[in-house]
Regions:
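Active-site-proximal substrate-binding groove within the catalytic cores of carbohydrate-active enzymes
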Residues: 61-163
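Carbohydrate-binding surface patches
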Residues: 169-187
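Intrinsic-disorder/low-complexity regions
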Residues: 33, 78, 163, 170-174
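Residues that form or immediately flank small-molecule/cofactor binding pockets and catalytic motifs
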Residues: 17, 117, 172
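Short beta-strand-initiation
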Residues: 98, 165, 174-176
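A conditional alpha-helix N-cap/helix-loop micro-motif detector
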Residues: 55, 92-93, 172
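Active-site-proximal helices and loops of the catalytic beta/alpha 8
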Residues: 1-69, 102, 121-149, 180-184
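Short Gly/Pro-enriched turn/cap motifs at secondary-structure boundaries
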Residues: 103, 167-170
Length: 187
């Protein structure tokens, strides 16, 4: 309350490992780290623990916990200062690229932890907090280009910024998941 009195535009972001719907209210937090998103993406693409149908169930259940405007403010990480890095968990570059695409197109705010964009790897804490790799020769340039491209597309797309979310396909046999985002005429 004191922070909002001092600066009504201040963003209050909380960290919680569970769903945050009880913490997100006008008199509480504006947003929270959405580890439910991270866990679903990691379980499907990095750990191969769940099917597309289970992914869909988890993502839609998560979205149902919040009013839509709140869901659009959730902070969606693939990893963080407290988790193994996605690159460390998923050594398959194609699956990693799919995870980035999911993160950049899913409702909410994509949270890119430093180094994610260049493929920084690291296991459990403290390895997830390793120094940034500044040597461009050691950076994953393809991954960086993908991040730049998807961020550019997201910035220009009303559907990706505030559009609705509908599942189009869950194929457990082929391990395919597709969804659609629309906002007016934009999709």
């Amino acid at each position: 309350d004191a922070i909002k009195k001092e600066n009504p535009e201040a963003l209050l972001l909380g960290e919680t490992w569970a769903d945050a719907h009880r913490l997100l209210a006008p008199d509480r937090l504006d947003s929270a780290m959405n580890y439910l998103f991270r866990d679903a993406a990691t379980d499907w693409l990095a750990k191969d623990r769940i099917s597309p149908a289970e992914l869909d169930h988890r993502l839609n259940r998560m979205l149902s916990l919040y009013p839509w405007e709140t869901a659009l403010r959730l902070y969606n990480p693939l990893d963080s200062h407290d988790t193994e890095r996605f690159r460390w968990l998923c050594r398959d570059k194609r699956r990693h690229a799919l995870a980035v695409a999911l993160q950049m197109t899913f409702p909410g705010c994509p949270a890119v932890f430093y180094g994610d964009e260049v493929g920084l790897s690291g296991g459990n804490d403290p390895d997830c907090r390793l120094a940034m790799e500044w040597d461009e020769e050691k950076q994953d340039k393809e991954l960086l280009a993908l991040y730049r491209k998807l961020i550019g597309i997201r910035r220009e797309s009303p559907s990706l910024l505030r559009g609705d979310f509908r599942t189009c396909l869950c194929d457990d046999v082929s391990n395919v998941y597709a969804f659609r985002r629309t906002c007016g005429e934009d999709e």
